[in-house]
């Protein structure tokens, strides 16, 4: 860190808005940004890398992943080939998030001592539309649970999460199912389709994610692994048909992502996870454990959601960043967004 007197340590809140697609996250984030617009240089909004997804070295990940399901249903591609194509397109979503996350992490002051307090204004806010955990865990796991991907594709996505710096505040956004279906139908992104089983599973998986983070604060995944049954077709169908996963104040391992990660393909003869995948599970656990989870309803207006998000700020975990690093981050974000406009 620079010793220049103008390069001072600041309190920063790193906030990631996440959740199922089409529920109004981006609109809520923009409204939150508008709320703080009266304070120049106070908040930095990092949008979804949509244009990169639309043209990642010449491939459109969004049209590709949804189009593959249409081709499979029409009989234009075999189920096995469709699973391979889906895994390919899902991997394309990961790269922009992972690269940006690595740049952000490198700019953070990761020391846990002498945290600058953020309970007194002004402090900086970095608001990101999604965390890499969306493209590496929540969406691929949901694709697997509806049969769009094979289990062989999961470890390369689930267990390769980047290290998580201190001060990650993950805000999972929710709406009622009727509102969700209405909103995602109206936004009509090119190539995007509405598949009810996938939407339902994704909603369940995000609740499992919150339960997982809470569970790992006081437990480890080893403790209850042997009590879990294998994730079978009956459980998968249940996840596709109802909102069967409930948010728990004190979740058990059966309420977490580990309930769907206990797959025969990842385990040995007696249900023990194979060593390589066990190490990967530790990576996933360490990343999740480092987060502070929150839930934000988007059921009402974007203005109401922005106000509700503001009320959560005092509960969030701060991080440190130098003023110089903050300026570098702004330049990086502006450069990326300028090239995707």
Swiss-Prot record:
Catalytic activity: thymidine + ATP = dTMP + ADP + H(+)
Pfam family for this entry, one: Herpes_TK
Effect of residue 154 to P: In strain: Isolate 40a2
Active-site residue list: 48 (proton acceptor)
Single annotated GO MF: ATP binding
Coiled coil: none
Enzyme Commission number(s): 2.7.1.21
Ligand binding (substrate): 66, 90, 189
Annotated function: Catalyzes the transfer of the gamma-phospho group of ATP to thymidine to generate dTMP in the salvage pathway of pyrimidine synthesis. The dTMP serves as a substrate for DNA polymerase during viral DNA replication. Allows the virus to be reactivated and to grow in non-proliferative cells lacking a high concentration of phosphorylated nucleic acid precursors.
Family, as annotated: Belongs to the herpesviridae thymidine kinase family.
Record's miscellaneous remark: Phosphorylates and thereby activates certain drugs like acyclovir (ACV), valacyclovir, and famciclovir to a toxic form, that leads to successful suppression of the infection, while the uninfected cell does not have this ability because it lacks TK. Mutations in thymidine kinase may induce HSV resistance to antiviral therapies in immunocompromised patients. The most frequently observed resistant strains are unable to express TK and are avirulent in animal models of disease.
Protein name listed in UniProt: Thymidine kinase
Organism annotation: Varicella-zoster virus (strain Dumas)
Lineage per the UniProt record: Viruses, Duplodnaviria, Heunggongvirae, Peploviricota, Herviviricetes
Gene name of the record: TK
């Amino acid at each position: 860190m620079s010793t220049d007197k103008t390069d001072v340590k600041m309190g920063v809140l790193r906030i990631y808005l996440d959740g199922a697609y089409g529920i109004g996250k981006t609109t809520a984030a923009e409204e939150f940004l508008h709320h703080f617009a009266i304070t120049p240089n106070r908040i930095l909004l990092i949008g979804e890398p949509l244009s990169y997804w639309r043209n990642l070295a010449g491939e459109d990940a969004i049209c590709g992943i949804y189009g593959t399901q249409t081709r499979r249903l029409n009989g234009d591609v075999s189920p096995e080939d469709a699973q391979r194509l889906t895994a390919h397109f899902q991997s394309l979503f990961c790269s922009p998030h992972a690269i940006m996350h690595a740049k952000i992490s490198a700019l953070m002051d990761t020391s846990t001592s002498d945290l600058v307090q953020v309970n007194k204004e002004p402090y900086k806010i970095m608001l990101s539309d999604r965390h890499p955990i969306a493209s590496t865990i929540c969406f691929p796991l949901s694709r697997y649970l509806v049969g769009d991907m094979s289990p062989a594709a999961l470890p390369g996505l689930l267990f390769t999460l980047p290290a998580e710096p201190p001060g990650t505040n993950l805000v999972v956004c929710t709406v009622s199912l009727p509102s969700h279906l209405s909103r995602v139908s109206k936004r009509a992104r090119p190539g995007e389709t509405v598949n009810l089983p996938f939407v339902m599973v994704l909603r369940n998986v995000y609740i499992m994610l919150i339960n997982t983070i809470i569970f790992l604060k006081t437990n480890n995944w080893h403790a209850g692994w042997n009590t879990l049954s294998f994730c079978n077709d009956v459980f998968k169908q249940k996840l596709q048909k109802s909102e069967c996963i409930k948010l728990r104040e004190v979740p058990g391992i059966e309420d977490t992502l580990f309930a769907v990660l206990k797959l025969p393909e990842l385990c040995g003869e007696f249900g023990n996870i194979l060593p390589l995948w066990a190490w990967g599970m530790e990576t996933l656990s360490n990343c999740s454990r480092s987060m502070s989870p929150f839930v934000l309803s988007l059921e009402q207006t974007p203005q109401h959601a922005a106000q509700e998000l503001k009320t959560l700020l005092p509960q969030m975990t701060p991080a440190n960043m130098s003023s110089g690093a903050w300026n570098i981050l702004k330049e990086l974000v502006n450069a990326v967004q300028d090239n995707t406009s």
